[in-house]
């Protein structure tokens, strides 16, 4: 996907570098960061995701912080959730029993590269079709005006 993003960025570079786009992007990102830090339950999902990533990477030890810790002193519920998150991932998902949890990543990257190639071909086809229809429309317009 990163290759497709690079191709897309080069294609639409002028639009991406406009002042209006940059200002709206900065405002949106700031707004999202503020809202994310205000909602403690998003932190619960974030902690679970981080613990999963650490387990897949083969971490020797995982410590999950209570989800409400950045906002207020942690409650007994948030401490219990933090304590049990890594245990649930290890016992119910059997992440500890897997020898190489990220072993199939090469195949996903291969499929991603195939998708990029197909998307780029579709973009090229759409651009050529658009140019072709523009030529036809222009010809019809000229014929209708008697040129």
From Swiss-Prot:
GO CC annotation, single: cytoplasm
InterPro entries linked: Cbl-dep_enz_cat (IPR016176), MeMalonylCoA_mutase_a/b_cat (IPR006099)
An annotated GO BP: propionate metabolic process, methylmalonyl pathway
Recorded superkingdom: Bacteria
Pfam families registered for this protein in UniProt: MM_CoA_mutase
GO molecular-function terms, A-Z: cobalamin binding; methylmalonyl-CoA mutase activity
Similarity annotation: To methylmalonyl-CoA mutase.
Protein name: Methylmalonyl-CoA mutase homolog
Organism expressing this protein natively: Alkalihalophilus pseudofirmus (strain ATCC BAA-2126 / JCM 17055 / OF4) (Bacillus pseudofirmus)
Taxonomic classification: Bacteria, Bacillati, Bacillota, Bacilli, Bacillales
